[in-house]
Amino acid sequence: MFLNIGFKSVTMDDISNEMGISKKTVYQFFRNKSDLVAHSCNTILDTISKDIEEVESWNLNPIEEMFEARKIILRRLKNEKTSPVYQLEKYYPKIYETLRKERFEMMDGCLIDNLRKGIERGYYRADINPVIISRIYHNGVTGLKEKEFYDQHIYPVPYLMNVFLEYHIRAIATPKGIDTLSDILVKDRNKSSMMPPSAIGL
């Protein structure tokens, strides 16, 4: 509900109605709405983390892993119309800051592992620094949601994430990696997800 409606808009009454229980019962498990928001954010992050771990168990090549991880994140955080991240930052700044740090730690670990694996298998250049590249990637992805730079009506987040991931891979890939990327793009690209609405007449 928080992702679909927004952290500010959802009330404890909404939660109790959605779950089919009394508000008193909700308060038996959560002290207040802030407590519920914090637990919900942790659950979302844990779910994404477990999904990514599952992808890593599929024995894909490192570039395929990145594209599958992107699909998971977009699926889990599919509703950007309510700007849940902005609402969280504005109305629950302490929770937002904690989540931001935990999200960075999760992403950083996954990316560094992916980069090292890519170097070892010949998909990424041997001269890159995995720690630095991981942080550059993290900052870049985070910046995609800056409204003053990207009009979400013209450039929706899924489109921006696709563009940025391709940009990231091209910057670090070997010829072998570029060939793999090209194969993935041929199979994966479709106008609705890879092009902004303005480019397809919406």
Feature map (PLM): residue ranges:
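Amphipathic, non-transmembrane alpha-helical scaffold segments
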Residues: 37, 41, 45, 96-104, ...
